[in-house]
Amino acid sequence: MVIFGLTGGIGSGKSLVASYFKTLFKAVVFDADQVVCQLYNCDNSVIKLVKTYFPDSVDHGVVNKNSLRQHFFAYSNLWVEFQSTLHSIILEKQKNFIMFHNRQSTKYVVLDVPLLIESNFYSCCNFIIHVTTNRLLQMQRVLYRGLSIREFESIIAIQLSENDRKKFANFTIRTGLSKGDVLFQIQKIMFDISHRSKYLSC
């Protein structure tokens, strides 16, 4: 089994790249954002965790994500502590996901994790792919999601720089051009690794 980790800033196109891996090469994708959403919606221990740190963000047992988002943008020491605990839960989910698909003899796993490098989610990766685009397109994608320019800049400020991500990456994919160009870059990566030695997951 080969494990790819995607690293890139918000709006860089990581989910797009992950979807192409899934479609073209039948890769399974660990979507950390989706996992977090499920935890907030259904996991009582996580809901309790949110209530412990931010009681104003839980109403009748339901996490108010808009309220919680404001705590994220405040980025206090309390948030950092909460985030560290939450990340340990997500990391355990990721490990279980990888072990399950290893038993299923899955060929390719893609980790779509926003803070792959920053939170040490990359240790099981055989290859790290740096996903990047130009800043204008990156900002347009984020604004389309409903975030403000100020929120976009706040997120960028806490993420690794492009240069730091490159230091960890084996490959780079640029998503600012056409879909066909992105597909070509992915196919080139797959051709490259197919001529290397076999890799084992952790």
Swiss-Prot record:
Q: Which Gene3D superfamilies match?
A: P-loop containing nucleotide triphosphate hydrolases
Question: Domain DPCK: where?
Answer: 3-202
Recorded hits in Pfam families, A to Z, give:
CoaE
Alphabetized PROSITE patterns for the sequence: DPCK
GO biological process, any: coenzyme A biosynthetic process
Annotated residues for binding of ATP: G11, S12, G13, K14, S15, L16
User: Where found in the cell?
Assistant: Cytoplasm
For this record, the Gene Ontology CC terms, alphabetical, are: cytoplasm
Which key words are in the record?
ATP-binding, Coenzyme A biosynthesis, Cytoplasm, Kinase, Nucleotide-binding, Transferase
Q: Any stretches that span the bilayer, and where are they?
A: none
Pathway given for this chain reads: Cofactor biosynthesis; coenzyme A biosynthesis; CoA from (R)-pantothenate: step 5/5
Enzyme Commission designation: 2.7.1.24
So which domain of life are we looking at?
Answer: Bacteria
Q: Which NCBIfam families match?
A: dephospho-CoA kinase (TIGR00152)
Q: Which family does it belong to?
A: Belongs to the CoaE family.
Q: What PANTHER family does its record include?
A: BIFUNCTIONAL COENZYME A SYNTHASE-RELATED, DEPHOSPHO-COA KINASE-RELATED
Name used for this protein in its record: Dephospho-CoA kinase
What species does this protein belong to?
Ehrlichia chaffeensis (strain ATCC CRL-10679 / Arkansas)
The taxonomy runs: Bacteria, Pseudomonadati, Pseudomonadota, Alphaproteobacteria, Rickettsiales
